[in-house]
């Protein structure tokens, strides 16, 4: 049984171990069957009671068997239980324990906060296991390896390089799938991340630097690959399943919300998403196919303006902006870039979460029920909101326009940052809240870069220096992403059915 849907075979580059590893990761999703190991993986899942959700089930939980739903009624959202694989969906009931499924979790930020005519709606990652949607990308990367028999959990560890939530999601999904894991992330990430990872991953490796120091993470991956035989590295920045999960799952979730909240004259004015690994941008590709008039904008920290200026630098918006262009970023679908000063999210997380800030928002006319939910926005979520506001103002969007964005995680991962800000700047009082509310109301259209065709190609070409020169990927694939983009990206999107078929066959044998 062979499912081989690779569109572009990569040619040898003569760069030895480094080239071999990163070339392997750059293939379209390899669905070749390794029968002997696949049988072992089936037996292991049978012993541990593990079943895998299909993409169709993650997109539409009504397809999930009632027996699984019954089990979930006695399982907490973050519990280490294999049935929580079926909570890798946007449709989880917003409950900490025993929740079922419902509509997509989202927040519409009121105009009293945004100051825009357009409506701004953000999907909320808080109600995924681990409190962030990155479990979706992690599952999409590891599950094909298990169902094809390419990964042996008895001899290999899954390595999850990340600037935050992806390695958390990877460590968690690895535990649910009974696979040992290694998490790699910068040393300056929030304390909550490290404390939680120590309870979940077999190894936690801190690399030098802050949010934007992804090069040091890549260097550690290369070192591990050279010195250890027990690791398989799932690099979110070049893993095509990361893009595919958001195209096939997150994009339809946005469409579902639009159908629910939009009126007869409503339009999707745009999608505004920050680029960490560029995985979520796959949802933008889906939305642009469904709503051809929609634009896709990419937010980045002004302190690290890679798209805006070919720039670099450190910043404080955890989860985005890593001084390079991810391999899985489809610039053919990207229409604009929006710079966000990292000082603003640090101010606005206080405005949204401190009592004085919430009072100021309510006094300004914001619905108290929505203000209560603003803790669903973590630092990068606030950054996305800022970018969405600037986008809506730049394009002069009106009352019939809806702008979608992403609230990847919540403030549960950043309470230490609030404490640090209080220690650094003093208690948050009404005077400071009023200042920050004025800053929010005064957001302008500075650092919004509307991209021409040539601008898009220029940004795409920046991949060369990271992925071809440094990491040994093949130049022909880089060119195919741009020159033959319909077949390249369309071929990837077309793999969902074959992958679901493999998962269904795998589960059927587990249940025998």
Stretches found by the model and what they are:
Residues 13-27:
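Short, Lys/Arg-enriched N-terminal segments with co-localized hydrophobic residues
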Residues 26-512:
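PLP-dependent amino-acid enzyme catalytic core
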